[in-house]
Amino acid sequence: MELKLHIIKSIQAAIAAGKAINTVYHSEDFGVEYKSDTSPLTVADQKSHEIIMNVLQDFDIPILSEEGKDAPYAQRKDWQRFWVVDPLDGTKEFIKRNGEFTVNIALVEDGRPTLGTIFVPDRDTLYFAAQGFGAYKLEDGPFDELQHAPANSAEQARILLGQIVEQSTQLPIEHPRQAALT
């Protein structure tokens, strides 16, 4: 039951963050700054991060976010469960205005991902998968269950991921969604 609540909250966080990203995306100024590693940081990155942190802080689970404070390894090495967040994955693509950016949220337990949520704001498309629940896509209507083969080992998962990467240049998105998610 607890995982179900995590799924719901991760979806709510991703969609709310994506809507904030889209507001900035369709504005004139992204407020681009550069981090110490010279990667770009926009107002959309910051707003998305704040929204996700506000939604997920209801749980007593640490959050490791690309835009958050650095948690030293000495602190996080003992985390049994934690959120991994990239509030705006593809900031360079966001700046190019090509629509190829996502909000990514994952829950890791005992070193293994148990939940993953990806929202594509420009296409209004949501993907999520959770251990014991399957994998789903939401675009233009109800959730569609995605077909997947079970990975029996880390090696099988690595091989499968390699095949997907070789055959794909972008997320499997057919058409932009017309109506906003509610």
Regions found by a protein language model. Name each.
Residues 1-88:
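N-terminal subdomain of lithium-sensitive/metallo-dependent phosphomonoesterases centered on the IMPase/IPPase/PAP
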Residues 21, 45, 56, 91, ...:
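Residue-level signal for inorganic ion chemistry
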Residues 24, 93, 138:
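Residues that scaffold the ATP/ADP-binding catalytic core of kinase and kinase-like folds
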Residues 27-28, 101, 129-133:
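A short, compositionally biased
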Residues 72-73, 92-95, 126:
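Conserved protein kinase catalytic core
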Residues 81-122:
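Glycine-rich active-site/cofactor-binding loop and its immediate structural neighborhood
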Residues 106-182:
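Acidic beta-strand-loop-alpha-helix segment within the catalytic core
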